[in-house]
Amino acid sequence: VLKFLAATPFGQTDPLFGRDIAFYVFSLPVYSLALGLIRSLIVLSLIISGTIYLLRGSLNLSTLLGKFNLNSLSEKLGGPARIATQSVAGGPPIKLIKHTNTDQKARLHIGILLAFFLATVAVGTHLSLYNLLTTQSGPVFGAAFTDANVMIPIVKISVFAYGLAALLALYYGMSGKFSPLMGAISLTVLVGLVSGIVPGVFQKLVVAPNELVRETPFIKHNIEATRKAYGLDRIEEREIAADKPITASDIAANNLTIKNVRLWDRAPLLSTFSQIQEIRTYYEFASVDNDRYTIDGEVRQIMLSPRELASESLPNKAWINERLTFTHGYGIAAGPVNQVTPEGLPVLFVKDLPPKSEVKELEVVRPEIYYGEILNDYVITKTKSKEFDYPKGEENVYTTYAGAGGVELNSPWRRLFYAFRFGSLKMLLSGDITPESRILYNRNVKERVAKVAPFLTFDRDPYVVVAEGKLYWIIDAYTTTDKYPYSQPLPLNGVAKLNYIRNSVKAVVDAYDGTVNFYQADPDDPIIKTYAKIFPKTFHPLSDMPKSLVSHLRYPEDIFSLQTAVYTTYHMDDPQIFYNKEDLWEIPAIAQEGEQQADSKASAMTPRHMIMKLPGEKKEEY
């Protein structure tokens, strides 16, 4: 409802009805919801009112059934009725209900309710016209030739029939004449039968023999809408000649590109980091992130992995260890993508505990990680118990949390509430917890941002960056809908289908105190504009993001993969070529280890970020 009230126009209209796309995304779902609620209330009122009138004898079904020549059933109901009194054995008089004619007020009430019900059916039938643009009945998604030339006229006739039936229901309530109403209802049933038979016959006899010619305009609608909805209309196609030999001048002109050629892939590097840099069994490198940093005045591509705490790997799983002592991960391992030691190991710019950095751009002064990718449990900080920071040889270094993250347990009621919420009696009874203690929960960064903005869709791969000596998580967020007319729906990450997407938001989470900030990255997206109207203090302009973080923004892999999948088909803009799938592309497959060629078991190539200078450009890009 809030989206309906704050709706932002798309500035684009559908090709069939000429309505702005915002009508389908924001308005139509609300109309359908409201109509469904109203219809449910009317049906409930009909059932309750009809039951009461029957029990009171104000509604005579026998008369109604007699109009349909159902005399035997009418006789069983007792025919006409009246109310009489009779005394039994000299006792008080007892009222006896005997069938009589329907009460005029009851009939009027039922007639009005029937009229309202049939009116909602008429409105719902009219709204179903617009659903034709977000369903598939022809060769492509959206209304096809049969829909435009057969279904739309049938639906309009149905709307007229239900509207007429609503008026005649009101007429029945006022006059008691039921036959005209039954005639109108019979007309709606007939139209329903026609709508179930005629379109299929029309499709087989008229459309199928010459489908390409008939469907060409609608294929064009689908191509144009899909390219707009997925942002493919912004793609600039260039032809790059690849038949010229590489010269020394080419190498010199692309020196930075060559310096940043990746020698390390994520999977083997993650395994290597785990072997040489986890240091303790309760630490875990969950992922390796690819980013770029300016080091000594030169852009370098860096592989970076945060060292998170894996509480399930603690040798002693006592409550005090899991909740009060071992509370956070510590530091990162990071190195260039293009260097290897003589032993075949990665060169590390940041390593060990406490983290030692060989370059000032990657120096971390606040290495504690209280919020991460695998931190799923609550912890309590600033307690009487020592809080483990990091191991130092045979000894441990301890710390006290100095951040503002979490909630202060400064009252018995608040402590009782969280003890009940997390099902922990020990939290309530522990003598280590003080009024200054803070409980930190929702520490998984993906779950954390989703709780703040559940209406956004988030990228699967949060990545950590070093900025001004601190660690931050950046999570790309998308605005999506499955209501964009004529746009082909596809699943994102194998989950729910959508047919419109924009990378409209960049979410930033402080790894130390959990502060979440959302920055509006696409000022032209109508959906994020609508959310910004609803939650004006939630989304900040991208210009407010610190420059130290802006330099680490990137094009997300999830949306790039989705756009690639769409573009394999929708690079074809000629309807005939598209219809025949004459130029369908395939995403390359990667051969498995030990195999010379990709086979059926090979996985599709995934996107990779790299630093390179494209032909015709003056400088390298990421």
Residue ranges, per PLM feature:
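Soluble extracytoplasmic regions of secretory-pathway and membrane proteins
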Residues: 1-622
